[in-house]
């Protein structure tokens, strides 16, 4: 039947399930449930049901038995299936493997062993430098090419939460997070701007209007600049695409301000991955308003970004298997 492994990547909004056999991807599905949906016990049961259904679907469709389940992201948090404590940075891939939590959850799958990967915490509790990762650590270790293992690289992840992460010579060392992705969703769905921009995934990013939004936020403030987006549409004749780009610029002004200390670090490469519209808006502002960056900039497509957690979790699992074999 082969060695079938299910990889679970739990996000704030969605949970992705990928079935692999050895190193080949067999199937994948995404369920619209995440950390933002599971703040009470009843909704946590929905997450358990979603995982159970995904396992049953994979096993039935592909006539297989899943024996190993690798899980990372918010599914390992207090609103997930099993809470795993964060590791204190700096953290290398081998440390993630050492601290992985194996367990049985027979009410979800009677046969599989679950392996829950810990997140990473940074700084001191209550300090301005405190922050956390859950899930992005496996994406970053999935993105590191063998020839880059000992380099210094900045990663910027664009999703429900935007993050800039510093990888230094084998370990993840620093991280800064913003809530810009969730803010964009809230603005587009629960404010008066809903009628001004429509569905946010329908439009591309227009650099010139991103920069207008950035400059408005820089000159005024966050809240005032957002209302200016509506004024620009009503009085200034902005299209929905231009208005949305303006809002991206406002969010990028906030992000670049938060990310600036790490952007000033000397690194070999800057890697952008995740949601493409955010990445394009970030580049439109970084090139004009950000600190001078002399290293290489690599932009991963959304499709490439989706594969990173699979690669990273596979590498963590291979590290575990290698250590077990060495101890026999």
Regions found by a protein language model. Give the residues of each.
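Short glycine-rich, Thr/Ser-proximal phosphate-binding strand/loop in the N-terminal lobe
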Residues: 5-46
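A short acidic Gly-Thr/Ser loop motif
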Residues: 8-14, 74, 156-161, 180, ...
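Glycine-rich phosphate-binding/hydrolytic loop that grips phosphoryl groups
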Residues: 284, 298-328
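Glycine-rich phosphate-binding loop plus the immediately following alpha-helix
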Residues: 36-40, 120-158, 163-219
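Short glycine-rich phosphate-binding loop at a beta-alpha junction
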Residues: 63-75, 252, 266-276
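Adenine-nucleotide phosphate-binding core of ATP-dependent small-molecule kinases
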Residues: 215-258
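Glycine-rich phosphate-binding loops at beta-strand->alpha-helix junctions
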Residues: 14, 267-285, 306
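Short beta-strand-loop/turn "lid" adjacent to the catalytic site in phosphate-handling enzymes
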Residues: 58-105, 110-130
